[in-house]
Amino acid sequence: MKTSKTKPPKSVLIAGPCVIESLENLRSIAIKLQPLANNERLDFYFKASFDKANRTSLESYRGPGLEKGLEMLQIIKEEFGYKILTDVHESYQASVAAKVADILQIPAFLCRQTDLIVEVSQTNAIINIKKGQFMNPKDMQYSVLKALKTRDSSIQSPTYETALKNGVWLCERGSSFGYGNLVVDMRSLTIMREFAPVIFDATHSVQMPGGANGKSSGDSSFAPILARAAAAVGIDGLFAETHVDPKNALSDGANMLKPDELERLVTDMLKIQNLF
């Protein structure tokens, strides 16, 4: 395995709430993230979902929807100067979301959906493909190649450098470990960095899917531990969901970090990356 990469000079940081709750809530989080966004060592993206289409229960809050959600993300982009990440679940959403978002994310459950990957790849946005909890990390090269060949039909095999050049990233978010639990195999980070830049999702990796009577639970106290380990193994950036009041968040509150907790985590991550 190769251990050195021609990687970007800055570490990527993708941070924000799980789902858009309101414009006021987005602003309250965006303000708290300004110190991180202004850190010269970070390439910062503000994230939030306009629709959580894969919630466990029909009764769970999903978000404001495509049109209203993108309007609010555009306001955050203009007011704070932040670059934006949001996820898309259906092919028709890609071209519309790309008018606002700098990164379009493919959810983990949809990481093999060819039509969705192709449609997102036809936009100018960076693509962040989350590794499915059920996926062999080696097999994520085929999802990467779908995106790369859509953007450049001459590409025959995925490499880290080619994926970096064409804006195709992968995101590790844990693997299924029996029912209702996830575990992170740190080997996945090195395996996937053979053919794409890799972002580590620290907060979804501590999720316990379906563990709370119709919704997911988790333990955010483990997120900093896993993130520090991932930084030591070697990653291109960190994904972490954050909220000013995680206990009352409308989605994934058990996994999210408060902004000050995230800031301490990122400080640790950068120190670890300095060692390599």
Curated annotation (Swiss-Prot):
Protein family per UniProt: Belongs to the KdsA family.
Molecular function GO terms recorded: 3-deoxy-8-phosphooctulonate synthase activity
Subcellular location: Cytoplasm
The protein's annotated pathway: Carbohydrate biosynthesis; 3-deoxy-D-manno-octulosonate biosynthesis; 3-deoxy-D-manno-octulosonate from D-ribulose 5-phosphate: step 2/3; Bacterial outer membrane biogenesis; lipopolysaccharide biosynthesis
UniProt keywords, alphabetically: Cytoplasm, Lipopolysaccharide biosynthesis, Transferase
Protein name per the record: 2-dehydro-3-deoxyphosphooctonate aldolase
Coarse class of the protein's main subcellular location: cytoplasm
Gene that this sequence comes from: kdsA
Taxonomic source organism: Helicobacter pylori (strain HPAG1)
Catalytic activity field: D-arabinose 5-phosphate + phosphoenolpyruvate + H2O = 3-deoxy-alpha-D-manno-2-octulosonate-8-phosphate + phosphate
Source superkingdom: Bacteria
UniProt cross-references to PANTHER family, sorted A to Z: PHOSPHO-2-DEHYDRO-3-DEOXYHEPTONATE ALDOLASE
Family matches, as Gene3D superfamilies: Aldolase class I (3.20.20.70)
Principal EC category: transferase
Keyword Transferase annotated: yes
GO cellular component, one term: cytoplasm
Gene Ontology terms: biological process: keto-3-deoxy-D-manno-octulosonic acid biosynthetic process
Enzyme Commission number(s) of this protein: 2.5.1.55
InterPro entries reported in the protein's UniProt record: Aldolase_TIM (IPR013785), DAHP1/KDSA (IPR006218), KDO8P_synthase (IPR006269)
A family per Pfam: DAHP_synth_1
